[in-house]
Structures are given as structure tokens and as C-alpha cells.
From Swiss-Prot:
NAD listed as a keyword: yes
Subunit structure: Monomer.
Induction trigger: Up-regulated upon exposure to O(2). Repressed by PerR.
Additional free-text comment from the UniProt record: The disulfide bonds are not involved in the electron transfer from NADH to rubredoxin catalyzed by NROR.
Catalysed reaction equations from the record: 2 reduced [rubredoxin] + NAD(+) + H(+) = 2 oxidized [rubredoxin] + NADH
Superkingdom in the source lineage: Bacteria
EC number of this enzyme: 1.18.1.1
Enzyme class: oxidoreductase
Protein name: NADH-rubredoxin oxidoreductase
Amino acid sequence: MKSTKILILGAGPAGFSAAKAALGKCDDITMINSEKYLPYYRPRLNEIIAKNKSIDDILIKKNDWYEKNNIKVITSEFATSIDPNNKLVTLKSGEKIKYEKLIIASGSIANKIKVPHADEIFSLYSYDDALKIKDECKNKGKAFIIGGGILGIELAQAIIDSGTPASIGIILEYPLERQLDRDGGLFLKDKLDRLGIKIYTNSNFEEMGDLIRSSCVITAVGVKPNLDFIKDTEIASKRGILVNDHMETSIKDIYACGDVAEFYGKNPGLINIANKQGEVAGLNACGEDASYSEIIPSPILKVSGISIISCGDIENNKPSKVFRSTQEDKYIVCMLKENKIDAAAVIGDVSLGTKLKKAIDSSKSFDNISSLDAILNNL
């Protein structure tokens, strides 16, 4: 039986950040990676499709870095169960590993849906997924992506950049429904249409048989936390594993971070949040006293020259005031509550979006404001 001081389940952004944070504080770290590769930059998977990059091009660190820092990476393995009482993790192979501190950074898994008329359905979550999509796009000659979120739009652009036509189908009226209001979503749809990314809205896939049968069909309809292996434990969970500001779970010496973690009801699934949570978990597993403060989600999309930044909860916001501006190449929306910007989105000007995010982060007050220009002039 193997043993380790810190065992990290997962080698994505949160898992790698946890391992990196523990360097110099713990000399015995083991990472479990379900894939056969060393940790890599998952956000760069589109480059495998668009730019013919290889796994070596997107690795976070080469093998010698792990050897130098005494970090063991066990590949092609994943946890099937945890025994917190005896501090044991059982892997798919049946091997058991004893730990002193456990960090669960198992990430998420792609949501799967049934698509009528599709013989095979793909999703992009791993390097091997990217290779399969790349090959199928060549075979079919075109791609049809179901899902109009950030991943779906970026994937469509990557496939188009590879030389294969791609379109998107969504059941709603406009794309990026979580990041944009209706006006912004329709503005973006029009921009993408003009750039060659066709978006079918209010789609009934049952009636789109010809397109679906002739395309590489890819779903990009969100993810869910990967936590089936904790079901027989007393580790508290709802949508994700419940954690406090030290990334501690309900069980002593077990931490969770990234997509698998739920922090006071929030589970945004963004890489900057995963990185920070992983850092906090890694430090605290080594006996430090680090705290995580909620980061206001601010996903950024850059595709075909269009930049989008969204700050706060646009989707569920109930503002007291809303200010909008639509220009030829720019769209702005600001949602205010109690004279403070609670959420905002900008298409076409990332620097302005960054200023609005700073105003949200600092809870800047905008008293007696009656126009968007007045807000922008006081950022």
C-alpha cells in the first residue's frame, strides 16, 4: 500500500494550483489524474482543433518539474471510494493509498443529453475529446454544436479556424443567457452571424434531422461536479462538496476546491476561481492559515475579434435601475441596486468591462445617477 502526506484527487487547474501552493511546505505530494497525461491547460483544448497543437504544447509543466519538486503524478487512475476513518482512497485499479491530508479537486464532467438523429455525440472536456472531434469534423465536413455558452461559441470558432464550417443550435432566444441580458444576447447573435457563426435559436432538434445527420454533433450544455465517489461517505454535499473559506469539508483533513466544490451555495466553474481555491486548499493542507474570499465571476470571451466581459449575476439579477447603450460595435449594460453596480456586461471593450468590475468589487456608490454616461464618467 502506498502512502503520502498530501493526496490530490484531480490534475486540473484546482489540483495543480493546490500542488504548487504546497511546494516548499510539504515534501510528499501525490496527484491522481484520470487522464494518461501530465496536467495541461484545459482552456487551450480549442488550440488542438484550431491550430494542430499537441499535448506537449499545452502541458503546464514538463515531467522534470514534477521530479524536481517530488510531486508524484499517477496517471490513468481515479478514485472510486474514500474511507475517511482510515484515511484511505481506493483507485479504479483497486490500489489503495493512505494519506495524511486529502484534497478533492476532481473537477466536473460534461452534461449529456440525447440528440435526435445523431448517431454519435461528442463533448469537449479532455485532450482525447479534442482529437476525436477533430477527426470527426474532417470525416463529416461540418460541425453542429448544441449549446450557446462560452464553450460552445469558442469551440465553433476553433472548428471554423481549422477549416470546417460550424453552426450552433440553442433552445433559447439568444446565446450566453447566463452572462448577457436579452438585448446583449441579441446584439452578440447578430455579430456572430455576420462573422460566419450561424446560431439557430428556439431550436427544435427533432425538426433538424438533415443538419444533425450530416454533421459532427457536439454538445456544450454545461458540466456537473464529479463527486460520485464520495456517495458512501459523510462528506457533506449539495450540488458540490460543501466547503468553508479554508476549503475544508465537513470531514477533518479533507479539503475540496474548484469545480467540485460548493462555497456558500456558489459553484461557478470558472478557472480563476478554481486556481484560487486550489491555492488556499494546498496551503491549508500544509498547516498554513489561508482564507478564500468570494470572487465575483467575470467570464471573458474573445472570439473573431469580439470581446465580452460579464461581471456579477446577470441571469438572476433583479436590479432597481438598468442602464444600456447599443452602438455599432459596442454594447453595455449596468444593473444597479442601492446605487451600486451589482452586475454589468460589455461587448466590444474589455478595458471598460474591467473598470466596471473594479467598481463592483469595491462596492463603489453612484448617488444621484440618472444615465449610463454619468456612471462611466465616474468609474
